[in-house]
Amino acid sequence: NHNPECIVNEPLGTDIVSPPVCGNELLEVGEECDCGTPENCQNECCDAATCKLKSGSQCGHGDCCEQCKFSKSGTECRESMSECDPAEHCSGQCSECPADVFHKNGQPCLDNYGYCYNGNCPIMYHQCYALWGADVYEAEDSCFESNKKGNYYYGYCRKENGKKIPCAPEDVKCGRLYCKDNSPGQNGPC
């Protein structure tokens, strides 16, 4: 798996291959909760000696667990990070927030100026700004024409067997990114 973001994900109980140990603060197979040792447990929903929920408790942890009960259906548990990443809401039936889902890659966003990609709406202005800072914008359309030629160091859309493949006319902005510096004294188109 080439997904480095997974390192920040809390492991599931089924991911742990050692036998369950009550009191180690890892929710493992067969445990309803695990808040550590009885001396250290600060979870009012969990019986630290048995790693079971206390009587009347529905849950002991999770983004959709409030005061030992499942959060109401529709309670926001993960906010929207962009137009392409809608907020997630509790189901009212479990303590965990649903998986983070994104709009389909390629769906138009920002008033059709960009397209969703992995939960973001990357547009060239934002990319230029991130690379170069304020006063830098997407260059004029004519600057992207070299991406159709395929003979420049960066002027192509992809490589196949080491050969640079030029961009189709409708894809010229999928190759090299051209930004324009609009600060005083800079007047070139690209």
UniProtKB/Swiss-Prot annotation:
Major subcellular site: secreted
Disulfide bonds: 33-51, 35-46, 45-68, 59-65, 64-90, 77-97
Annotated propeptide span(s): 104-190
GO biological process terms, semicolon-separated: proteolysis
EC number: 3.4.24.-
SUPFAM superfamilies, per the entry: Blood coagulation inhibitor (disintegrin) (SSF57552)
Positions of the Disintegrin domain: 19-105
Cofactor note: Binds 1 zinc ion per subunit.
UniProt keyword annotation of Secreted present: yes
Membrane-spanning residues: none
Domain of life where this protein originates: Eukaryota
Location of the Peptidase M12B domain: 1-11
Keywords, alphabetical: Calcium, Cell adhesion impairing toxin, Disulfide bond, Hemostasis impairing toxin, Hydrolase, Metal-binding, Metalloprotease, Platelet aggregation inhibiting toxin, Protease, Secreted, Toxin, Zinc, Zymogen
PANTHER family named among the record's database cross-references: ADAM A DISINTEGRIN AND METALLOPROTEASE DOMAIN (PTHR11905), DISINTEGRIN AND METALLOPROTEINASE DOMAIN-CONTAINING PROTEIN 28 (PTHR11905:SF32)
Similarity field: Belongs to the venom metalloproteinase (M12B) family. P-III subfamily.
Protein name: Zinc metalloproteinase/disintegrin
Taxonomic lineage from the root: Eukaryota, Metazoa, Chordata, Craniata, Vertebrata
